[in-house]
Structures are given as structure tokens and as C-alpha cells.
Amino acid sequence: GTGAGSPSEGYPKLLNAFAGTKFKIISGYPSSTAGMLAMERGEVDGALTSWNTLKRTKQQWLQNRDINVLVQYGTERHPEMRDIPTVLEIAGTSEGRAALAFYIGGAQLGRSLVAPPGLPAERVKMLRSAFDAMLKDRDFLAEIDKSGQEFYPASGEQVQKLIAATASAPRNVVELTETTLRAK
């Protein structure tokens, strides 16, 4: 893992607690790239990374089937990985699914564009309209395509719903998630 509090340690802890896995977390790798290199060297048996990163940096592994993708850390299956379950699908209890969904919600919000609180509604609407227009701009989309990055934008309204769902998570779900993540 890349350190306490990082997804590379959080997800395995949550899966150990709620899906019955027995991952041994090895801390101290400075980045997910270092974790992948450790796997390549045989220092560790697995690592957490994004599908996009795996496709861009380890294409040979995928082509040669040198790697097994065990689970997806998201709420829905990625279109290119229809046969790989999500963490929510393998959680053994409704409490486990709730804790994982809460944790995933925070990760999904991690890449949001935000404005300060109290911004007048008309400005929020204007910013959202400008953002939505950018998402339809041919030059912008061409740059995204050229970068090779996956791009799955969410509208301001979708992000607002995710924020509301995450912020209104029941206290017992928040506490269960915190307790599990803090456990040794």
C-alpha cells in the first residue's frame, strides 16, 4: 500500500472485513507505480491501480494474460471488464455493501470541480452550463482522445446527488467504515 488512508490500503481492509478476503497489506510504497513494480519483482502478490493506468502502462501484461484483475472498485462494472465483479457485488452483507458504497462515494468525489459555498444559484448554473458546453467541444474531446485517458464526466447535478448521498450516509455506516479503516 501507499500509506494509511490511501485507497491501496483502504479497499483491501474493507474487503477483508466485508468480503472475507485475507489480503496482507504491505505499507510503504511511495506510489501505485512503485506498488506495481513491487508486484513485477515478486515482492508482493497484488497491487491496486486504475484500469486506465493498467491499460496504458502494462498493456503487455493484459495481452499476455500475465495479470488477473480480481475486482473493480466502483459501483458499476466498467464496459471493458464486464466479467469482473465490483466490490459491492462481493461484499457479504448489506452493512458491508453500505460501507463500501460510502467509501467509493468519497473516491468518486475526489476529482470534482467545485465552487465556494454561498455562490449565487445563477452563477452555479452558468458554470455548469459552461462545463457542459466544454464536454461537447470537438477540440476538447480531440485532446482527451489524443491523451489516451479515459474520460467519464459527470454533470454538476449528478455530482450534487453523490455529495448528498455521501453526506447523508447513516451514522452507523460512517462509523463502521471508519472503524474498519483504522483497524490494524
What are these regions (language model features)?
Residues 1-89, 93:
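Ligand-binding pocket segment of bilobal, Venus flytrap-like solute-binding proteins
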Residues 5-8, 29-32, 103, 120, ...:
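Solvent-exposed, acidic/flexible segments
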Residues 20-21, 44, 112-114, 149:
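A broad detector of the eukaryotic-type serine/threonine protein kinase catalytic domain
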Residues 28-29, 47, 112-115, 144:
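Long, contiguous hydrophobic alpha-helical segments, chiefly transmembrane helices and signal peptides
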Residues 47, 104-109, 165-174:
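Charged, low-complexity, helix-prone segments enriched in Lys/Glu/Asp/Gln
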Residues 57-135:
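C-terminal lobe and pocket-closing loops
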Residues 63-66, 90, 96, 118-184:
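An extracytoplasmic/periplasmic, membrane-proximal ligand-sensing/linker region
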